[in-house]
């Protein structure tokens, strides 16, 4: 339907002004037009002496609070898309990152939507830990006046699939809130499920919340300060790998690479604490092995996202081959009627255990079958990029980005296996070769705004990466705050990552203290948490001086051990019981003085 413009003599604009306005707004979305309407109304009201009649008070429009709890950016993208959908439907919405949400106001929420991922062993994403703890504490209020919906993102290769979403959904209902929609648990291929859920949420909320006037939309705090980049996960930058240097010794059990990527004149920006997303290709030899095991040729046509590709090309570029899941094992067993795998079907624990220990290609080798190409594609998950903590600051390296990559290598019955992305960077991209990358911003792992604030950095293994970026930034800023690094690895002589750089920072006085834990250099294993305990009194003094604490690395063991040790130190030197120590650390987290980048 076309709306006819009124006669020009009835308009308050002359033809030239009208033409300029139409040209300026020709490509605006309905949401942007609504915002502009409210913006001009605000400008008019601010003009001194403007003789404008005050509009009649509008009926109060309830705000939909949309909480984004993201670990790798996917939950944030779903939440942003839902925000745009709600604004397009003229609903009043406020999007807030879980780390910024004042959770004690939750009792006042009328309409609440949570989009959350899960990390580690079923834990909430880092930015949602404080909210999660609050809801599960004795302080959580009754939520009888709240209606809610939850969308969970997860990965079926992990045992506690979408556990954070399940936790929020169950706890909100337990506290008396009304469930608007059944929770959705989405796997790594979440886009279709998210689009369907968003449409249902919009319809459910339209029935609950009246449409807001444009000015009300514009003043509702609807748009959060979310980063935008010229390149994204969906449209990555094709950059150049300029340096691939092994930084562990020849006798090390680990293969760790320092990777430098030239961003050219792309204008791609990042901050210390951000992650680099890397799109990789599977090893052609792995593709060939899998195809041959299934008695296929590799040139069979298959359909991927509406395009027809040869099977081998589809497997190399579009499907996950290095991570098996319980679902894949179960579906393969059912499809092939495998005598060795069928007994696992229905036993979640056994399926999970088998998938964790057996790559897809070895599952096919141990339980051979013949599948057609489309059946194989139907079993597999789409390839997803890997995220690496950035190990550089643009204040020092300008148009480069550095990452520290632990290359995954192991054997299955004498056959060499490797991680998909790590071996791609280490083995298959030549220097000056192309690699597709994007920045995943992480505002939950940031240096203190005040350069005089002390910083405590705890990062064993490749967890050292963001702290290299931190120190480059502190050096460039001339920051006067003290810096203390805890680092650990198996052997001093083989595994001291960036040793010369850390020694230089110590010599210059920028790195105030460094404590090193070498787990295999003596009979008794020593880890970073042991060094924390050993330095407990001094650690407590730094905390009392306002230090910010950062932890980076393994989520499943190290991060938990470090947190337990921090609680012990707080309890002992702060003269607190366990409950008070936990409350103290939670408060540090809320104040952004305890931040973690764990994976």
UniProtKB/Swiss-Prot annotation:
Residues 64-202 form the Flavodoxin-like domain. Pathway: Sulfur metabolism; hydrogen sulfide biosynthesis; hydrogen sulfide from sulfite (NADPH route): step 1/1. GO terms for molecular function: flavin adenine dinucleotide binding; FMN binding; sulfite reductase (NADPH) activity. Its EC number is 1.8.1.2. Its cofactor is FAD; FMN. It holds the Pfam family FAD_binding_1. Binds 1 FAD per subunit. Binds 1 FMN per subunit. FAD binds at residues 322, 356, 386-389, 404-406, 410, 419-422, 599. It catalyses: hydrogen sulfide + 3 NADP(+) + 3 H2O = sulfite + 3 NADPH + 4 H(+). Keywords: Amino-acid biosynthesis, Cysteine biosynthesis, Electron transport, FAD, Flavoprotein, FMN, NADP, Oxidoreductase, Transport. The keyword Protein transport does not apply. GO terms for cellular component: cytosol. Disulfide bonds: none annotated. CDD domains: SiR (cd06199). Coiled coil: none annotated. NADP(+) binds at residues 519-520, 525-529, 561. Gene3D superfamilies: 3.40.50.360, NADPH-cytochrome p450 Reductase, Chain A, domain 3 (1.20.990.10), Nucleotide-binding domain of ferredoxin-NADP reductase (FNR) module (3.40.50.80), Translation factors (2.40.30.10). One of its GO terms (biological process) is sulfate assimilation. Residues 234-448 form the FAD-binding FR-type domain. InterPro entries: CysJ, CysJ-like_FAD-binding, CysJ_Proteobact, FAD-bd_FR_type, Flavdoxin-like, Flavodoxin/NO_synth, Flavoprot_Pyr_Nucl_cyt_Rdtase, Flavoprotein-like_sf. SUPFAM superfamilies: Ferredoxin reductase-like, C-terminal NADP-linked domain, Flavoproteins, Riboflavin synthase domain-like. FMN binds at residues 70-75, 117-120, 153-162. Component of the sulfite reductase complex that catalyzes the 6-electron reduction of sulfite to sulfide. This is one of several activities required for the biosynthesis of L-cysteine from sulfate. The flavoprotein component catalyzes the electron flow from NADPH -> FAD -> FMN to the hemoprotein component. Belongs to the NADPH-dependent sulphite reductase flavoprotein subunit CysJ family. In the N-terminal section; belongs to the flavodoxin family. Alpha(8)-beta(8). The alpha component is a flavoprotein, the beta component is a hemoprotein. This is Sulfite reductase [NADPH] flavoprotein alpha-component. The lineage of its organism: Bacteria, Pseudomonadati, Pseudomonadota, Gammaproteobacteria, Enterobacterales.
